[in-house]
Amino acid sequence: MEQGVIERARELRRRIENADHRYYDLADPEITDAQYDQLFRELQELEQKYPELVTADSPSMRVGGAVRKSFVKVRHSIPMLSLANAFDEVEVKNFVDRIFRRMGSSNPLEFSVEPKFDGLAISLRYELGKFVQGVTRGDGDVGEDVSENIRTIRSVPLKLKGNNVPAILEVRGEVYMPRDGFSEFNKRAMARGEKLLANPRNGAAGSLRQLDSRISAQRPLSFFAYGVGLIQVEQDLFEEIPQSIASTHSAMLAQLRAWGFPVSSLVEVVQGSDGLLAYYQRIGEARDGLPFDIDGVVYKLDDLAGQREMGFVSRAPRWALAHKFPAQEQSTTVEAIEIQIGRTGAATPVARLKPVHVAGVIVTNATLHNADQIARLDVRVGDTVIVRRAGDVIPEVAAVVADQRPPATQSWQMPTQCPVCGSEIVREEGQAVWRCSGELTCPAQRKEAFRHFVSRRAMDVDGLGEKFIEVLVDSGVVQGVADLYLLTVDQLLQLRMISTAESPHAFLREAREHLASGAYAQLEATLVGIGVDLAGEREVPQTWQADLLRAGLPTFDWNRKKIATKWAENLIEAIETSRDTTLERFLFALGIEHVGESTAKALSAWFGDLDLIRHLPWPLFKRVPDIGGEVARSLGHFFDQPGNQKAIDHLLARKVRIGDTHPPSPKLRGELRLANLLEDLEIPKVTPIRAAQIATAFGSIDALRNGGPEPLVEAGVPQSVAESLATWLLVPANDTLAVNAQKKLSALLAMMPEAGEEKTGPLDGQTVVITGTLAALTRDAAKQRLEALGAKVAGSVSKKTAFLVAGEEAGSKLDKAQSLGVEIWDEARLLAFLGEHGQQR
């Protein structure tokens, strides 16, 4: 073998080891992941070609090797002892006092402090600077040999740095799984349908105990060193770090770092109990932002001679203490599983728990995230579960203790109705989240419904901001969006006065200016009636504002010199103005899931009438271009809810007027065929070709309903398709849907004008894109005028784009249009074209 090959292999090992050191120990990588992979592959190829190059400390050994049948038990040369625990400040102060009294020192005691890593304790043995063995802590006396798995951890050095390396060195530390590595591993496992890791600690322990080290090599493990065991320097064996190497624990950690071991950057040296407790506080506050899990901090007397003097008791050192954080995981029992409805309608399952202390608080509820998560965990009422809480994160059910499950438990099923409003709970195919379909009426969604309803692109109620919407809803003054049209100036002024008052007394002082004496006395009596002690001897109820509004207020005679009323008058005027609207805006304002402005515009253009749209079976919506099954079903779910229909009735009763009602577009005529309906019903196995075949043979839904599969087969329909259709029609809900859709299709055809009656615009059917800044009009105004001429205004350029309107500072869209040969219009040409066709500014 050539000397150059040997030198190249040596150089590759050196560079890879240095890269590992800079990445894991210094957090300062100097090469990219791709460059690292290239070096690693080159070394592997050399060692495969020349097996005699392979050494025990080669980085290539980290990929794992042969499968073991079992782990060998190994007795520790020096026992791996446990630490005494402290859970409060008194125990920490007692710990310091005991050392102080025993040492008899007049100087402040110094301690080396570090996080208590939540992983698996390990002992690493090096001989002549090379890694030879890794052993788990086990029971402290005997552990298991996991050397092959340890070799796969890139942050564990296989060969030590420096010239003063002991002949034998045992290093104690913690193998852990970083949080981001844990998350990524579980994402990949979920995608492959594999079992998820319960938490990073279990992930680290399970990874090290894999009999196949190739599996360990795929796990994102890392390592921190925090102590030493047996050391041999020259011919002398030491059971602790010798004075010649270090005289303090912190100096020993610095030496370990110099030899190439990763040591936490959070290690510090502090003085006395105040220093210990301040460190505990700092680490506790930083805990949730750390890249790894910890469950406390560890205090060690820094002076090694002092450690020797303090000694041990009951297999624990007197000179060290673990100050534990309150547990972030505990087990408890699921007493019920209920549904919470969020402001956007998302239905989140929540476990009601037997109360348990987790991370310093009593937890009685924990999120289960969604129905899929419940199915993955198989959480059932009565189960014993592991509850996790980290910092301010909402407590969650992390795992089920399956072997403690009581008999006769049942799998949980998502309810079919919203627990708040009774509307149907639905989930679109492929979505994780179930939603309440009572968008307009569900109290849980009320604020979001109002915010959307009054927004600029919906009903455009100018001056009604988010904070005042909260006041309106929280006060109970408005129960549904139609209640906006019942508001008065008096109500708005009273609401603001109450909502901004710091106390009932402050409200009374301000209200006095606007009330006659009799009305003022009535207001005082009302406050007393809702539990407010005007003498100030009892605590004011937190809900006094809402309670007062519900109880009713006397008539105010507003002193306009003392209060501004113009804002309220303007808001009422804006509400009145919004009564006159378009069908497009009204549909968008309803807040139907998946129905944005463009879909609302298409529905308005193609159907033209609210009464028609709100009673249309969902498959017929699919005849509108760009409306697919998901949007169509969402429309159907919305209009199927009695509460939503009642909310629309209330809006119309409050004189909300749609001014652009028109007959359905004649373009629908060619779409309203039985073949299309059969396709749009989404019947399994009924393809467009089969739908056309069935429509030709039978002519109506009624002809298909009662014959079963035989007539279909006789008409040439394949047996499997015939059986699928017949089975589908046997479901009452499907049968009703098909019949209603057929009836509505016929009614639509009857009310539709002939094709020649429809007016078309000069841009009918053309797609236009606008980019850059226009000087004479806004992008929205340009879009509206182009759409009025029949154009579809899109957000991206494609081969189907008819032309691009390019304003100032046009960017990548202009470049793409030019590359595709799309016609380019400047603003002057656009304005001229709009003027020619009656769309002047």
UniProtKB/Swiss-Prot annotation:
Catalytic activity entry: NAD(+) + (deoxyribonucleotide)n-3'-hydroxyl + 5'-phospho-(deoxyribonucleotide)m = (deoxyribonucleotide)n+m + AMP + beta-nicotinamide D-nucleotide
Residues at the active site: 116 (n6-amp-lysine intermediate)
EC number(s) on file: 6.5.1.2
Ranges where the BRCT domain occurs: 758-841
A Pfam family of this chain: DNA_ligase_ZBD
Keywords: DNA damage, DNA repair, DNA replication, Ligase, Magnesium, Manganese, Metal-binding, NAD, Zinc
SUPFAM superfamilies: BRCT domain (SSF52113), DNA ligase/mRNA capping enzyme, catalytic domain (SSF56091), Nucleic acid-binding proteins (SSF50249), RuvA domain 2-like (SSF47781)
GO cellular component entries: cytosol
Necessary cofactors: Mg(2+); Mn(2+)
Top-tier EC class: ligase
Database matches in Gene3D superfamilies: 5' to 3' exonuclease, C-terminal subdomain, 6.20.10.30, BRCT domain, DNA ligase/mRNA capping enzyme, Helix hairpin bin, Nucleic acid-binding proteins
Keyword Kinase among UniProt keywords: no
Amino acids binding NAD(+): 33-37, 82-83, 114, 137, 174, 300, 324
UniProt binding sites for Zn(2+): 418, 421, 436, 442
Superkingdom of origin organism: Bacteria
Gene Ontology terms describing biological process: DNA repair; DNA replication
Record carries keyword Ligase: yes
Transmembrane segments: none
Purpose: DNA ligase that catalyzes the formation of phosphodiester linkages between 5'-phosphoryl and 3'-hydroxyl groups in double-stranded DNA using NAD as a coenzyme and as the energy source for the reaction. It is essential for DNA replication and repair of damaged DNA.
Family per record: Belongs to the NAD-dependent DNA ligase family. LigA subfamily.
Stored NCBIfam families: dnlj, PRK07956.1
Protein name as annotated: DNA ligase
Gene from which the chain derives: ligA
